[in-house]
C-alpha cells in the first residue's frame, strides 16, 4: 500500500460555486471523497489538503520526507504560474508528482501558459474538468502497479 498526497492550491475551496462554466459544479469535498475511495479500492491511502497559503502547501510537501508519502498529486491553481518556492519544495523532497488542472491553461490568458512545475512533473493532466483528477490518479495507480 502506498500513501498518496493530494494538494489543492488557492481558490479551489470555492469549487462548485466559482466560475462553474470553467470549473464545474462539483465541490472539493466531493472530489476528495471520490479520489480517496478510488485509491482505497486500488489498495492505497490518500490524504488531501487545500490551502490558499503558499507556505502551508510548502510545509505539507516538506512533511512528506518523513511521513511515507510515495506520490504527490497537485493542483497548484494560480501558484502554477508564480511559485518558484513551490517548485523548489517539490524538488527538495524528490517525490514523483503529477500536476493537475481542471481547465486547460493553454487555452486561457497568456499569463497562464507558463508552469513552474510542468517540466519537473511526471505528467500534467489538464482540461478535462473534474475528470482531470481521476485521470491523474489512474496514472499514478498504474505507475504504482497495484490496480485491482
From Swiss-Prot:
Binding site for substrate: 75, 81, 88, 102-103, 112
CDD domains membership: DHQase_II
Active site: 23 (proton acceptor), 101 (proton donor)
A Pfam family the protein falls into: DHquinase_II
GO biological process entries: amino acid biosynthetic process; aromatic amino acid family biosynthetic process; chorismate biosynthetic process; quinate catabolic process
Protein family membership: Belongs to the type-II 3-dehydroquinase family.
Name this polypeptide is given: 3-dehydroquinate dehydratase
Organism field: Xylella fastidiosa (strain Temecula1 / ATCC 700964)
